[in-house]
Amino acid sequence: MSAKTNPGNFFEDFRLGQTIVHATPRTITEGDVALYTSLYGSRFALTSSTPFAQSLGLERAPIDSLLVFHIVFGKTVPDISLNAIANLGYAGGRFGAVVYPGDTLSTTSKVIGLRQNKDGKTGVVYVHSVGVNQWDEVVLEYIRWVMVRKRDPNAPAPETVVPDLPDSVPVTDLTVPYTVSAANYNLAHAGSNYLWDDYEVGEKIDHVDGVTIEEAEHMQATRLYQNTARVHFNLHVEREGRFGRRIVYGGHIISLARSLSFNGLANALSIAAINSGRHTNPSFAGDTIYAWSEILAKMAIPGRTDIGALRVRTVATKDRPCHDFPYRDAEGNYDPAVVLDFDYTVLMPRRG
């Protein structure tokens, strides 16, 4: 192999405390927004309508929280997970400055944990990634951990360091960029009359609708984020792999589930935090994705009576409607149809 090409990092290439500045900065355009909308059909009013966003004190319609996440995440793939077997989870994700078309995002990651697996062939790398805009304002930070192959199974194992991971992002750490006026908040345009006050802890919502994944669409979405993980693209190689076909990028499932959640959570303006997330089973083209959500917590935001926070678990399934809320069995094992277990916090207007 030429020394000028990049094979990606293997487990033994990572060092505790290592900082990685990822290529390439990305200016988000109106075209990116249009393509994202065409891929997922998101109907949330905040990111669809500039007048609606302006009624909440913003200058115009912002970039969808998850489009920000995917672009920040995509920057990390060539350095962190090009040789990954699996992306294992997320924690401590916090959205910061509002992102608008024309903003340029870049990402830096720090290795905060390493643990070699017992087989000696792989290890788990924990990274804290930070995305910033052109003014170095943090737009997103999160922790993720990923299982990565070793180049040499005989390479010595590093000292095991597993970081303490937060259970959730405290409400006091949430960025709340909106100001809601009951007189100006248009429930008809938002798509639902149900606000923060109308949800109860433990309430479960079947989002009803399903959407089938197309091969071209999931690959186009992954390219949109400049995510280069070969398992999503290279059928020539993956045909001989564990599944015999390309795997759908897990973030594609997150965005599909968020879009489906409009039916039941239409006033969830944006995602303020990612508390945890697991891709519990792989998804493939031809799978039909359904979703349901549970309200885990209702949180009043200190000093605010116009807006509150809901901690939500959204579960996505493949080829299985969610009228009976499939999740885990008595032993804690996931239903085989569950492909995503996503715990996040949304901002939602309160009744005046």
UniProtKB/Swiss-Prot annotation:
It comes from Chloroflexus aurantiacus (strain ATCC 29366 / DSM 635 / J-10-fl). The keyword Glycosyltransferase does not apply. It catalyses: (2R,3S)-beta-methylmalyl-CoA = 2-methylfumaryl-CoA + H2O. Homodimer. It comes from the Bacteria. Optimum pH is 7.5. GO terms for biological process: carbon fixation by 3-hydroxypropionate cycle; glyoxylate catabolic process. Induction: Under autotrophic growth conditions. GO terms for molecular function: oxo-acid-lyase activity. The gene is mch. Involved in the glyoxylate assimilation cycle used to regenerate acetyl-CoA and produce pyruvate as universal precursor for biosynthesis. Catalyzes the reversible dehydration of beta-methylmalyl-CoA ((2R,3S)-beta-methylmalyl-CoA) to yield mesaconyl-CoA (2-methylfumaryl-CoA). Its EC number is 4.2.1.148. Substrate binds at P62, I63, D64, S65, I85, A86, N87, L88, G96, A97, V98. Keywords: Carbon dioxide fixation, Lyase. Residues 16-129 form the MaoC-like domain. PANTHER family: BETA-METHYLMALYL-COA DEHYDRATASE, MONOAMINE OXIDASE-RELATED. This is Beta-methylmalyl-CoA dehydratase. InterPro entries: HotDog_dom_sf (IPR029069), MC_hydratase (IPR048274), MCH/BMMD (IPR052342), Thiol_ester_hydratase_Rv0216 (IPR016790).
